[in-house]
C-alpha cells in the first residue's frame, strides 16, 4: 500500500490540480477586470519606493496593512517614517493554512495514499487556495480603490487607525493641492448642522444648489479651469441632498414653473425619478458629470468576539469622505506608481506575479506552527498630476 508521507505543501499541489502557482493566479485576471480607480492609469513599475508628481496643465475583502518594506505583514508602526516625503508605502497581508484546517484529509492521505484523493477532497483544497488567493487579490484592488477615493475626496492620503489599525499610523501623504482649493462651510450655511441629515437639521442659511453653482463659477473664473468638471460625492450624501427642502424647492420650480406654492413643488419633486432630479441638478449647477460613490472598505482590527474574548473583528470604513464634495476634471487626473516587490529567497515555483508584477503572492512554510502562509506584497500609490485643478468642499457634519 502506498503510504507516502504527506506535508502541507501537498495541499497546495492538490488544490492546483496540475497547474503551477503562477497559472493558478493568472485565472483571476478575468474576474478582476473592473476597478474603481477611474481617472488614474498605471505607470510602468519603478526601481525605488518613491513617487514623482509631474504637475501638468490643461488648456486632472479587507484592506492590507501599510508597513515598512522590510517588515512582515501587520508590523507595528515605525516612528521614524515620515509622511509627505514622496515615499510609496508597502502593503502586506497573509492567509495561513495549517494542519488543523485539513487534518482529517491529510491523515486519510497519509494512511491510504493517493487513492484517497477524491474530487471532493481536491475541491476542498482548491477552496482553501481560492479563498487565500482571491482574498489577497481582492484586497489589493480594494486598497487601490480606497486610495483613489480618499485622495479625490480629501486631497491627501492618511494612513492611520481607521484604515490601518495593525500597521503604520500617523502618516499623511500630501499631493500639493493648494490650500485655497479647500472650502469649509460653517455655521448655518452648512447643509446640515447635525450628522442626522433630516429637514429639521438643515442649516437655516443653507442653499446647496447655489453653493455648488458658485463653486463651479469660482473654478472657472478664479482658477481658470475651462475643461469639463465632474462632481463626486458619497452616495449617502447624494441621497440626503435629494431630500434637502431647498434643493427640492429649486428643482420643483424648475420642473413646474406654473406652480407657485412651495410645499406643492417640493411634494412634486419628491415623487420624481432620481435620474430626472440629477439631470435638473446638473443643469442648474453647471457641472458636466455627477458621480455618487457607493464605496466602502473593510479592515481587520483587534477586538472581542461575541463571547467577549480577544479576537480579530472586521470593521467597515468609508472610502469617499462622507462630508465632502470633490470637483475634478473629467478624464485622467493622475497615475498609479509603484515597484515590483522583491522575492529573494523564495523558490521560483512558490512565487506568482499578478497585475504585471505589481502584486506578488508567495508560499512560505513555517515548520514551527505546521503552517503554510499565502502572502501578498504590493507597493502602489495613486498620484494626482493635476492638483491645481482639484477642489474639495466640506458641506456638512
What spans do the regions from the language model cover?
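Contiguous N-terminal and early-domain "leader" segments and peripheral loops that mark the onset or edge
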Residues: 38-59, 135-138, 142-172, 177, ...
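Assembly/oligomerization interface modules of large self-assembling protein complexes
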Residues: 37-112, 166-174
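Surface-exposed polar/charged interaction patches
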Residues: 14, 18, 27-31, 115, ...
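Short, Φ-rich (hydrophobic/aromatic) sequence segments
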Residues: 25, 211-216, 350-351, 382
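Extended, solvent-exposed, turn-rich assembly/linker loops in the middle of proteins
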Residues: 166-281
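Long, contiguous amphipathic alpha-helices that act as assembly "spine/axial" helices in icosahedral shell
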Residues: 89-181, 207-239, 370-378
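Sequence/fold signature of self-assembling virion shell proteins
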Residues: 203, 247-397
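N-terminal alpha-helical "arm" segments
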Residues: 1-52, 383-397
Amino acid at each position: 500500500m502506498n503510504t507516502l508521507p504527506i506535508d502541507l505543501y501537498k495541499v497546495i499541489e492538490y488544490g492546483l490540480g496540475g497547474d503551477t502557482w503562477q497559472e493558478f493566479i493568472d485565472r483571476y485576471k478575468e474576474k478582476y477586470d473592473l476597478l474603481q480607480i477611474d481617472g488614474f492609469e498605471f505607470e510602468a513599475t519603478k526601481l525605488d519606493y518613491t513617487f514623482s508628481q509631474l504637475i501638468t496643465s490643461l488648456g486632472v475583502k479587507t484592506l492590507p496593512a501599510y508597513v515598512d518594506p522590510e517588515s512582515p505583514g501587520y508590523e507595528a508602526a515605525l516612528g521614524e517614517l515620515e509622511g509627505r516625503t514622496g515615499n510609496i508605502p508597502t502593503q502586506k497581508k497573509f492567509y495561513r493554512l495549517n494542519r488543523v484546517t485539513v487534518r482529517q484529509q491529510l491523515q486519510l492521505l497519509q494512511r491510504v495514499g493517493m487513492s484517497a484523493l477524491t474530487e471532493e477532497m481536491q475541491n476542498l483544497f482548491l477552496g482553501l487556495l481560492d479563498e487565500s488567493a482571491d482574498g489577497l487579490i481582492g484586497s489589493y484592488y480594494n486598497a487601490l480603490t480606497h486610495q483613489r477615493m480618499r485622495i479625490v475626496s480629501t486631497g491627501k492620503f492618511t494612513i492611520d487607525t481607521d484604515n490601518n489599525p495593525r500597521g503604520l499610523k500617523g502618516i499623511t501623504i500630501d499631493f500639493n493641492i493648494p490650500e485655497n482649493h479647500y472650502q469649509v462651510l460653517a455655521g448655518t450655511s452648512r447643509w446640515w448642522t447635525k450628522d442626522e441629515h433630516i429637514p429639521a437639521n438643515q442649516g437655516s442659511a443653507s442653499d446647496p444648489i447655489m453653493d455648488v453653482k458658485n463653486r463651479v463659477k469660482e473654478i472657472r473664473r478664479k482658477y481658470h479651469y475651462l475643461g469639463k468638471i465632474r462632481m463626486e460625492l458619497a452616495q449617502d450624501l447624494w441621497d440626503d441632498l435629494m431630500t434637502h427642502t431647498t434643493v427640492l424647492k429649486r428643482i420643483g420650480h424648475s420642473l413646474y414653473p406654473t406652480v407657485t406654492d412651495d410645499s406643492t413643488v417640493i411634494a412634486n419633486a419628491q415623487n420624481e425619478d432620481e435620474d430626472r432630479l440629477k439631470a435638473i441638478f446638473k443643469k442648474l449647477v453647471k457641472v458636466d458629470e455627477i458621480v455618487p460613490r457607493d464605496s466602502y472598505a473593510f479592515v481587520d482590527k483587534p477586538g472581542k468576539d461575541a463571547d467577549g474574548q480577544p479576537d480579530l473583528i472586521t470593521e467597515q470604513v468609508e472610502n469617499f469622505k462622507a462630508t465632502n464634495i470633490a470637483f475634478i476634471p473629467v478624464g485622467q487626473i493622475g497615475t498609479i506608481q509603484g515597484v515590483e516587490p522583491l522575492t529573494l529567497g523564495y523558490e521560483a515555483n512558490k512565487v506568482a506575479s499578478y497585475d504585471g508584477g505589481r502584486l506578488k503572492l508567495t508560499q512560505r512554510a513555517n515548520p514551527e506552527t505546521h503552517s503554510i502562509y499565502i502572502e501578498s506584497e504590493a507597493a502602489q500609490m495613486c498620484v494626482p498630476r493635476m492638483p491645481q485643478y482639484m477642489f474639495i468642499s466640506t458641506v456638512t457634519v
